[in-house]
Design a protein with these regions (language model features):
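Glycine-rich phosphate-binding loops of nucleotide-dependent enzymes
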Residues: 2-257
Length: 257
């Protein structure tokens, strides 16, 4: 399988603190790849490095065959790499549909002058945007609430809306940071089904979370991070039975249980 994302020797230091140290992994086309670890393990820092929010202290990141190390988020989004954040990033006073339109900016915005004047190209771009909004809302089961204010949605649906905004740019790779944090088990199951539908549309995913049950039932491969370093890497079954993972999550006394 073709490697879509390649991370080699990734590191980030904050003063004397090594938040991420020598992470190396790859994500193939069409894969749901997981990164898990206890709170404070360095998962979100790794995502920030890959998505361009934070510059790495060392290492290399390649996406779709090109070196993208240190490139800013808007450049990566245009190349097909987008992400969500732990907290919901929706405009609460805008409708679900209006929120989705925001996500089309990078891929469909015609430029300042075409947008200012009513050109044929600008009209075509706006029409394409509306078509895409309707498609994404239908796809993620948000069409029935499209005209409601985002603030009126349950928290789980707001998380799905954040995913919809990121999908408006039709990324090749979508990174989801803590997609089920704060959700009930039923809401988490719904998010898992939504992620699978996204993958079925040909979009690869990197999912970052500390919910072991959720991740084991979703991802093909999982990287376990602890203190900013790789602790284990493999299939869900391999990492769930790894002694170092058991010790990190449950304590040393459970390793031989």
């Amino acid at each position: 399988m073709t490697k879509l994302l390649e991370v080699e020797g990734l590191a980030r230091n904050f003063g004397g603190l090594k938040a991420v140290s020598d992470l190396t992994f790859g994500v193939t086309e069409g894969e749901i790849f997981g990164i898990i670890g206890p709170n404070g393990a360095g998962k979100s820092t790794a995502v920030n490095l890959i998505s361009g929010v934070t510059r790495p202290s060392a290492g290399r990141i390649r996406f779709a065959g090109s070196d993208v190390t240190g490139q800013p988020p808007h450049v990566l989004a245009r190349k097909g790499l987008t992400r969500t954040f732990q907290s919901t990033t929706v405009y609460r006073n805008q409708t679900v549909r209006e929120n989705c339109r925001r996500g089309a900016y990078l891929s469909l915005y015609p430029g300042f002058l075409p947008a200012l004047f009513t050109t044929a190209r600008a009209k075509a771009m706006r029409a394409a945007c509306e078509d895409r909004v309707s498609e994404i809302l239908e796809w993620l089961d948000l069409a029935r609430v499209a005209e409601l204010a985002a603030s009126s949605l349950p928290y789980g649906a707001q998380k799905t809306l954040g995913m919809a905004i990121s999908l408006m740019a039709w990324p090749r790779l979508l990174m989801l940071d803590e997609p089920v944090a704060g959700l009930s088990a039923a809401e988490a199951d719904h998010v898992r089904d939504t992620i699978r539908r996204v993958r079925d549309r040909g979009i690869s995913l990197v999912v970052i979370d500390h919910n072991m049950r959720f991740m084991a039932n979703l991802c093909e491969r999982i990287l376990v991070v602890h203190h900013g370093q790789e602790l284990a890497h493999g299939t869900p079954q391999e990492v769930l039975t790894h002694p170092a993972v058991i010790e990190a999550y449950l304590g040393r006394k459970y390793v031989r249980a």
